[in-house]
A protein has these predicted regions:
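Short, flexible/disordered intra-domain loops and linkers
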Residues: 105-123, 176-185, 208-213
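Secretory-pathway glycan-assembly enzymes, especially type II membrane glycosyltransferases
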Residues: 1-125
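A donor-sugar binding/catalytic signature common to diverse glycosyltransferases
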Residues: 186-232
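Acidic carboxylate-rich catalytic motifs and surrounding loops in phosphoryl-/glycosyl-chemistry enzymes
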Residues: 1, 146-154, 205-206, 230-232
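Well-ordered, non-membrane alpha-helical segments in soluble/globular domains
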Residues: 118-137, 187
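Structural motif
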Residues: 94-95, 146, 200
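Catalytic donor nucleotide-activated moiety binding site of glycosyltransferases and closely related
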Residues: 98-105, 111, 128-181
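Short, aromatic/basic amphipathic alpha-helical patches
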Residues: 9-20, 155-165, 216-221
Length: 232
């Protein structure tokens, strides 16, 4: 990266007269931030954000440069870059599809902001079938390009092995917010950067899914690629 962005605690001000604390979750609707944020050069802003895909809307003067600013701050480590190359998909040679199930199929998070566990196997099979049909529609629209599917559900990824699409290895899948290890963290970054290097990315949405996930949106901004939604 071009900038040493890591700050020490001694670099930060905590005097209220010099700082302003900003929680992006206070700004949920599209226009609720308007008129409430006036940036001042003599203030230090401490921004706490989980839904980072909304940041360009809240700070519009940086929105058009999000991609450039990201790459000034971050670049893949040598180890991550090696893992990305080992995936075997040249950049812009595939279409990415992302599906975030959270607890809908495996129910592997005991605590989650998305309580979407499905009760019956029949309901789970129905959701899987609808997502598969959504992927086939995407494939039909992009016949001459590989479709690379990403998901937090090993069960779903195993269910599409018979389809004319591709996946990465399904080991080390997890959510880093709820317990993690080095391999799981690496898998998360592999998925993020592989999506960012696609020609474009589709996010599959459904009432049962964690459809407001910002993962694919963030990857699309990193790669400055088109982001589309497929409802199932």
């Amino acid at each position: 990266n071009d900038i040493d962005w890591i700050a020490d605690y001694s670099d930060l001000h905590y005097v209220l007269s010099k700082t302003r604390f900003f929680n992006e979750l206070d700004f949920i609707t599209e226009d609720s931030w308007k008129g409430r944020i006036e940036l001042k050069k003599d203030k230090e802003y401490h921004c706490y954000s989980y839904v980072g895909n909304r940041q360009p809307d809240i700070f519009p003067e940086s929105g058009c440069k999000w991609h450039d600013l990201f790459h000034e701050l971050f670049k893949p480590s040598d180890r991550l870059e090696q893992k990305l190359q080992e995936c075997g998909f040249p950049e812009k040679s595939y279409i990415a599809v992302h599906i975030r199930f959270v607890n809908a199929l495996e129910n592997f998070e005991k605590v989650s902001c998305c309580d979407n566990a499905i009760d019956t196997e029949k309901q789970k099979d129905d959701l899987i079938a609808r997502c598969q049909k959504g992927i086939l529609r995407i494939k039909e629209q992009n016949k001459d390009c590989d479709i690379l599917v990403f998901s937090d559900s090993k069960r779903f990824l195993e269910s599409i092995k018979h389809m004319p699409v591709k996946t990465l290895p399904t080991n080390n899948i997890g959510h880093i917010s709820f317990g993690t290890n080095a391999d799981m963290t690496m898998k998360t970054f592999i998925d993020l950067y592989m999506i960012s290097r696609a020609k474009k990315v589709y996010r599959i949405d459904a009432p049962e899914l964690y459809a407001w996930s910002g993962f694919a949106v963030t990857a699309a901004k990193i790669g400055s690629i088109e982001f589309l939604t497929e409802n199932v």
